[in-house]
Amino acid sequence: MKTKIFITGSAGFIGFHVAKKYLDKGFKVLGLDSMNKYYDVNLKKDRLKILKKHKNFSFVKGNIENIKFLENRVKKFNPSVIIHLAAQAGIRYSVKNPGAYLNSNIIGTFNILEISRKIKIKHLIIGSSSSVYGANKKFPFQEIDKTDNQISFYAATKKSTENLAHSYSSLWKIPTTILRFFTVYGPWGRPDMA
């Protein structure tokens, strides 16, 4: 039986590349994305067209903030791994619309953690951000550096998701890996990162 992987944010830049890599290796992937309009939705649609060429890929449009919808889809698919990359991105936009960050990044991640706990996921991987290092003056950053002073609302939500994930991992023994992405660029990248 093929390993099943559930990827949130699968139409996003990082999610697309992760999904494609696992599909190319023969895994079954269920992708979820809200297809929000933070940047041109056509770019997300074009990424999805490529993923949909794989017979082992299925996609559902939806929000991670909707736990009933999310739980229904995840339980039906029954993955052994969840890769949680969905998030409201962008530091500048977090000043204009902090509610979007609270809902997507914190509530959405809480929902992913709850579902991971309920289905006893074998491994949970969560995308975070280098912005959690905030006002840290030491350079270059290391994983062991302090992350106590975020300087944007976006960074504060990403640090909050790390804390929630650590708590869930400790309390319910959910094997969890958190990845702190720095500026990510490449083919099919976000236009605001150019």
Where are these predicted regions, by residue range?
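N-terminal Rossmann-like NAD(P)+-binding domain of SDR-like oxidoreductases, especially those catalyzing
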Residues: 1-184
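Substrate-binding strand-loop-helix patch
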Residues: 187-194
